From Swiss-Prot:
GO MF terms held by the record: peptidyl-prolyl cis-trans isomerase activity; protein folding chaperone; ribosome binding
HAMAP family listed in its UniProt record: Trigger_factor_Tig (MF_00303)
NCBIfam families associated with the record: tig (TIGR00115)
Gene Ontology biological-process annotations: 'de novo' cotranslational protein folding; cell division; chaperone-mediated protein folding; protein transport; protein unfolding
Its EC number(s): 5.2.1.8
Protein role: Involved in protein export. Acts as a chaperone by maintaining the newly synthesized protein in an open conformation. Functions as a peptidyl-prolyl cis-trans isomerase.
Protein source organism: Coxiella burnetii (strain CbuG_Q212) (Coxiella burnetii (strain Q212))
Protein name per UniProt: Trigger factor
GO cellular component terms attached to this protein's record: cytoplasm
Annotated compartments: Cytoplasm
Free-text domain note: Consists of 3 domains; the N-terminus binds the ribosome, the middle domain has PPIase activity, while the C-terminus has intrinsic chaperone activity on its own.
Recorded catalytic activity of this chain's protein: [protein]-peptidylproline (omega=180) = [protein]-peptidylproline (omega=0)
Amino acid sequence: MRGNFMSSIEKLGGLKQRLTITVPAEEVDKAYKSRLLKVARTAKIPKFRPGKASPAVVEKLYGKAILQEVGSELIQSSLREAVEEHQLQVAGAPDIKMDKILRGEPFKYVVNFEVYPEITLESLAGETIERTQVEITEEDLDKMLEALRKQYAEWKEVDRPAKADDRVIIDFEGTLDGKPFERGSAKDFQLELGSKRMIAGFEEGIEGMKPGESKALDITFPADYPSEDLAGKAAVFNITLQKVMAPELPVLDEQFAERLGIKEGGLEALRQKVRTNMEKEVHHHMENKLKMAVLDKLIERNPIEVPESLIEAEIDHLQQMTRQQVAMQTHKPDEAKKMELPRDPYREQATKRVKLGLLLAEVVKQHKIKADPEQLRARVEEVAASYQDPEKVISWYYSNKQMLSEIESVVLEDQAVAQLMSELEVKDQAIPYEEAVKQIQQ
């Protein structure tokens, strides 16, 4: 079929449009007869050899089904041609409402859909963003090494009062108005004093207690405590201290370096490795922060309307990601799949992601950006480095077009951001390492 139909376009406001398509009766009959003959050649009908039943017999048995198939085929072909004819950039899945298809009569259907917005990119010239620079001092490095020593500490039981940074084993029971409450008690509970795992006053109240000692603590739950039954309530915790254990830190020497995988170079090699890891962590975070600042400027300079259908599809995608995360955390994939999630909390994020996708695609198109092979290779190698056989993983990526295209999309986005950065002014701002860590943890 080519052009044997009538179509009209109606703009409904915003990005919404409507196509009305009418296929003439003679085209309906022509398509029906063609389909009927095709079915008759292969139909297996009782008392007839395959393909030997007359079209009249086939029509009697399958006429209604054939007519429905013809309707679907006519929609598929005529809609595609109408979209080309009107030069439409359809976004998302169209909503099709069709009249009943009948032989000898015109076949009419209506298509409601959205189109992609027309984008005229505004340059970011004149905009300014801050790029955070982080200097890691020897003091920062020493603190990190001390933290590593604490991670590898051996805990030794001691016979003295408990103090901050000790690990204690306790029994406790919490009561409200003299009555125990749910999840308010435990036996042989392990706790590091100063970890702030418990509500304010709990860990502090254990400090100074001796092994075998019991004590009652009067503690009020915070007003914003997650459990409404406990928020703002005054409770009594009866605590018995079973054990006090103090950390015995390993010596910072070559043997400790070997425990952390340093086979050559000893303590100096360990310091260099730790510094490199610290630099990588802050660099990755600050680069991402810079990228988001650039993208925020892109959205500010280029306000666009986005198709609602794409937002809804992106909400579906975000919810699917949430379910996958829950499945990994709980190890209950079947329950995670059935989770019913509200859509509104995802709408703002989904809208922003769709806007960025459309705007970045336009940046790539306007500046004729193509994925740089060297950057692509570097990205693939970065992913492969976390596997046991990196070379095998690299070969697999380059033999799998779909997986490689996903990394290619990331590279294109990075190149688009680099293009945008070249248009604006970047001011460097130095911050201490500790401040950078706080930002990462937020």
